[in-house]
Amino acid sequence: IATLMLVGCGLSDERAHTLKVYNWGDYIDEDLIAEFETWYEEQTGEPVTIIYQTFDINEVMLAKIENGHADFDVVCPSEYIIERMMRNEMLLPILTPEFEKEINDKNINYFDSVSPYIKEQFSLLEAPEGQDPNDYSVGYMWGTTGILYNEKYVTEEEALSWDLMFDKRLQDKIFVKDAFRDVYSPILVYAKTLEARQKGELGEDEMLPIETIRELMYDSSDESIALVESYLKRMKELVAGWEADFGKEMMTQEKAWINLMWSGDAVWAIEEATEVGVDLAYTVPEE
């Protein structure tokens, strides 16, 4: 989660008692909103109204904020969007002097319970000099990007490689998440892995070092963009559609057999599919 800069020089009394949240769909049970409003007033003696909106694509969310169409207090972007928001001075530190005093008085420390791994990952985000991403954002949810597949048509072994996304046998049965970063990075890593194997730099079953993979995730050179473009053009001939949220239903209804998907959506789809007798599974390709 990142805390957004508020627009304007001051807040009206009504706005001061309003919390605007911009989050991914399906992340919070909206019944909790009314419960939180009640709980907050019981705890503080102050009323609060939650205005809760959802989005399904990072770039749509960011454009809405950058264009001045929203003054959200809290948003939930992916890590690369946090980097962009910090560069554009769109975020405020989470710990204002007043808030820091309050949590110190109550002996609350977020970092006492946060996973060291998650804290490390936030520290690795690119930020303007002298700024720590951990001061502007806290972890909310994290997961992986991989392949959700129908076990009737695809084996686990097949799903362990991104080769599957280019299998002509699956033409018009493939859906891909409409999320730039989550498609670009895996395809680039896959392409570079094949390239290294062809050059003899890697064995047939060897993978790129983790340091190289991390570098590729941030590689937006013209050469890499052109390489990914060439692979996406091949994939385009096989893909039935690009989805932001409806891929889960397509898999559950067996209208798609594989879907490049986030792990959270995959778990939801697997549970729903089980109820109707469809066997789905999820894996992260080895590349």
For the regions a language model picked out, list residue spans one by one.
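Short secondary-structure boundary segments
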Residues: 79, 178, 263
